[in-house]
Each structure stands twice: as structure tokens, then as C-alpha cells.
């Protein structure tokens, strides 16, 4: 309740009309990062509608407390923790399209997302493959590793990269005890044989991606 009141203070004395205008201004700032020229207004509408939907997720799952510190409710421990957290995203196939876009056009946002991934690992022992808000058993493979690697190779550094490296290595050699799509199902076969035998698992190609 106290945090809800704290969040309400961010509105100040603005009325609904002013808040709506602030929202429009913010979206224009975000979408205006890319300028497109086309004589066909429908092409412009399509592009910016798609860009708008692209940057809706991952959803920010953090806020600032009364001391001005960034905090989040951890879906993994059920407690309030310091730092960033993001949710409502699956990395298949956003690792090859959305996250490279974030690295190019919104790098400061993806630095926060990377910090949130590090917090997910520290609080749960694994990187997420599909967060909603915690680990969800509906995604296979280690696409989170691609998200982490692409951010680092794109030059992003404003987060704990060493912790994320540990998370990537761990996720390639372990399976979550309750959500077997998190981690690398079949890693024992792959590490020993270099492949996963056909009859050992369903979706045999995806777990070792």
C-alpha cells in the first residue's frame, strides 16, 4: 500500500488530460528514435505501429521506493529486492530480431534488461527463457544465452556481465528442478556425444540451441 502511494506521487498535480499528453509525448520520443520517409501514409502507419508493438515488451517489473532506489518484487523469492526486473517476454524468436533492435536503438533500455536478467539468475539460479512473471514452462532451448551474448558484443556494459556469463555457463549444464524447459534439457547427452539422441527427448534439436 505504501509503495502504491509512492507511485501515485509521481503524477504530481497533473490532471487526466495532462497525463494523456505526457504519455503521447513519451511515445513520440520513443518512436521518434527512427525517422522514416515515405509518401504513402499507410506505410508509415504500418512501420510505427509495428515499432510500437515491438517496444511494449519486455515489461518493466520494477519501481522506485521512497528513498529513490530501484526495487522489484521477486517472483522467485516472494520478497522485495533491489535492482531491475523485467517480465512478460519469451526469447524465441526475439533473440534474433527484437533484442538486436534494442541494442542498436535503445541500448540504455537493454542495459537495464540485462541487469534484470542477472537478478533473475541470482534470485532463481537460472536465466529465464519465458518470464511471466517468473519461469514459465513453455519455452525450450537456451535463447537467453544469445540475448546476453548479443548485448555484450554490441558494446553494452552498464550491468554485471560477469554474473551473466556465469548464468550462461550454468544454464548450458543444468536443468531447472521444477521447470525443465529452463536450462538445457539433454545437456548430458550433448556434452558427452555432441548431439542428443533422437529417442531420448521430444523437441530434440531445440534444447541444445
Question: What role is predicted for each listed range?
Answer:
Residues 1-85, 126-129, 157-177:
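Acidic/polar, glycine-enriched structural segments that form the non-catalytic walls/loops
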Residues 12, 34-38, 85-87, 99-103, ...:
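Second-shell loop/turn segments in exported
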Residues 20, 43-44, 90-94, 106, ...:
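Active-site-proximal structural scaffolding
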Residues 37, 87-88, 107-111, 116-125:
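A conserved hydrophobic secondary-structure block that centers on an alpha-helix together
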Residues 52-53, 57, 98-107, 147-158:
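Well-ordered alpha-helical scaffold segments within catalytic/enzyme domains
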Residues 66-75, 95-103, 109-118:
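Glycine-rich phosphate-binding loop of nucleotide-binding enzymes
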Residues 120, 128-146, 150-152, 158-200:
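Surface-exposed loop and adjacent secondary-structure segments within mature catalytic domains
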Residues 200-208:
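Residue-level detector of conserved catalytic or cofactor/ligand-binding positions
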Amino acid at each position: 500500500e505504501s509503495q502504491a502511494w509512492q507511485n501515485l506521487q509521481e503524477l504530481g498535480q497533473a490532471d487526466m488530460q495532462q497525463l494523456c499528453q505526457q504519455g503521447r509525448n513519451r511515445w513520440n520520443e520513443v518512436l521518434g528514435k527512427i525517422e522514416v520517409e515515405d509518401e504513402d501514409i499507410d506505410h508509415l502507419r504500418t512501420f510505427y505501429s509495428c515499432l510500437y508493438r515491438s517496444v511494449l515488451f519486455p515489461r518493466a517489473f520494477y519501481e522506485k521506493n521512497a528513498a529513490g532506489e530501484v526495487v522489484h518484487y521477486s517472483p522467485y523469492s516472494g520478497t522485495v529486492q533491489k535492482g531491475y526486473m523485467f517480465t512478460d517476454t519469451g526469447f524465441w524468436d526475439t533473440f534474433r530480431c527484437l533484442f538486436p533492435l534494442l541494442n542498436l536503438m535503445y541500448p540504455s533500455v537493454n542495459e537495464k534488461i540485462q541487469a534484470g536478467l542477472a537478478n533473475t539468475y541470482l534470485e532463481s539460479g537460472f536465466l529465464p527463457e519465458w518470464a511471466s512473471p517468473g519461469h514459465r514452462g513453455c519455452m525450450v532451448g537456451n535463447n537467453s544465452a544469445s540475448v546476453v551474448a548479443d548485448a555484450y558484443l554490441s558494446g553494452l556494459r552498464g550491468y554485471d556481465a560477469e554474473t551473466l556469463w556465469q548464468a550462461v555457463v550454468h544454464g548450458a549444464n543444468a536443468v531447472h528442478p521444477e521447470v525443465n524447459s529452463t536450462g538445457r534439457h539433454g545437456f548430458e547427452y550433448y556434452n558427452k556425444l555432441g548431439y542428443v539422441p533422437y529417442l531420448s527427448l521430444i523437441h530434440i534439436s531445440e534444447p541444445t540451441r
